[in-house]
Amino acid sequence: MTENHYLLLTPGPLTTTKTVKEVMLYDWCTWDVEYNTMVQKVRAKLVSLATKEEEKYTTVLMQGSGTFSVEAVIGSVIPKNGKLLVCTNGAYGKRIVQMAEMLHIDVVVSQTEEWEPTNIVEVEKILQQDKEITHIAVVHCETTTGIINPIVDVCKLGKQYGKVTLVDAMSSFGGIEIDIAELQIDFLISSANKCIQGVPGFGFVIAKRDELLKCKGQARSLSLDLYDQWETMENQNGKWRFTSPTHVVHAFYQALLELEKEGGVRARYNRYYNNQKLLVNRMGEIGFKPIVNEKYQSPIITSFIYPEGNFEFQQLYNELKRYGFVIYPGKISKVDTFRIGNIGDVHEEDINRLVDSIAKGVVIG
């Protein structure tokens, strides 16, 4: 466990290393050449993490939470006469639908139960029947439950039917290997405070250059204009249009260096995967069962069903917080669950200490 007042067992914000925190002790100017050069390095490193075909893609950094970046894509990429198909099985897919509706974008939904992955057969049926669909969006890791959706199949179908593909990889990018060129992803969205293990403050979009160039003049917002943000960064050496989160960018750059030092995305995936397997096995020993089938479960966060009896999540939360752990309440609409994340600077000994705290009767007697 790192030096921290709590170990965050959440899907982000998450527990960061001491060295990531330390780089935020200093102040920087947004116009400084050294800072803008760092922004350019960050952009390049993100593309190299995303694909080997780096010349075809570019990165746009966007102030705010990851949701801001998702909305920047939805509001900038889809033209006025466009139509969006959203695959949803959780809160974050629903949020994309809500964005589209607020922005007066024609939207159709393929919905499955929160503990079931996107139904590829239904998606293809919708694409066959509705020729007006121009774009298709899917959440890779839906942290409502921790389920992984079949983005390979969704994107393959999307391209088979000539659609632009949008992937919300908020809680998977940097923790699960993804080659966006191989998967034919046109726009991938993620955030600083997820698997790369930075802190909150900006999101980013890795975009296919050819598709991004089509977005000029389409944005439905000034501050969330994806094309204008990219054009400024691209042509003015990493400059942001409006005040950027300088401390967060420095922390993120440090986090990228630490990802490389750990061994890259594959090594980080292995740590997360081992954390999650240990968590499920140990929690199973004391009577807690995950809601998601193992074959669909991500290594990011796990939803556990409330056990029978007099179980109160708030008591669990309060007691674990006293012992230095913070977990997440459930977000599933039909089943009582709570969630435990295992990303961030979290290791085997941390998972064991957590479950030991529960098993000893700290919460459940």
Swiss-Prot record:
The modification N6-(pyridoxal phosphate)lysine is found at K194. One of its GO terms (biological process) is organic phosphonate catabolic process. Its cofactor is pyridoxal 5'-phosphate. Belongs to the class-V pyridoxal-phosphate-dependent aminotransferase family. PhnW subfamily. The gene is phnW. This is 2-aminoethylphosphonate--pyruvate transaminase. GO terms for molecular function: 2-aminoethylphosphonate-pyruvate transaminase activity. Keywords: Aminotransferase, Pyridoxal phosphate, Pyruvate, Transferase. Homodimer. It catalyses: (2-aminoethyl)phosphonate + pyruvate = phosphonoacetaldehyde + L-alanine. Involved in phosphonate degradation.
